[in-house]
Amino acid sequence: MKCTLVSTLFAITNILVAHAQVSNSSDTLDVQFANSTNSYIEGKFNSTDEAFNSSASWSLAAQQKKISNAAVYDVGGWNGSLYRSNRSAVADHQPGKKQDAAISQISDGQIQATASGPETTAATTPSSTANVSVYEGAGMKVESKNMGYIVGVAALLFL
């Protein structure tokens, strides 16, 4: 009976952890600076198909990036709210460019980011892929290791 109870608790734990991972997925924006300038947001977030709405180009020979307008992301945090935006998603990878980013919450967690400044600048990043933290939610975020620990302690108490 105890084994059945423990097995049931572990099964419930796996279901809860999977649900927590889907509902509260990682707040990571994966921006790829390439010829296609495609980007995607992992997890439950939605984004436009093109990172810079066809206004960015990448020159491999001169290693220069031309950026005039950033993307519009529909990220929608917990309960569709935005808690903290990252204003340096592009500027972090263009140290030689003074980035003026205007990020505002429009509605339902939609962010519009516009960048202005010199059109071309030297790119010093060796890699063309960068992981940028977009925002973080307020309150407790259930992680798999924390959830497993909590349910594991609860299972030991029932034994």
From Swiss-Prot:
GPI-anchor amidated glycine lipid modification positions: 137
InterPro entries named among the record's database cross-references: Yeast_PIR_rpt (IPR000420)
Cited Pfam families: PIR (PF00399)
Residue ranges of the propeptide: 138-159
Keywords: Cell membrane, Glycoprotein, GPI-anchor, Lipoprotein, Membrane, Signal
GO MF annotation terms: structural constituent of cell wall
Protein name: Probable GPI-anchored protein ANS1
Organism: Saccharomyces cerevisiae (strain ATCC 204508 / S288c) (Baker's yeast)
Name of encoding gene: ANS1
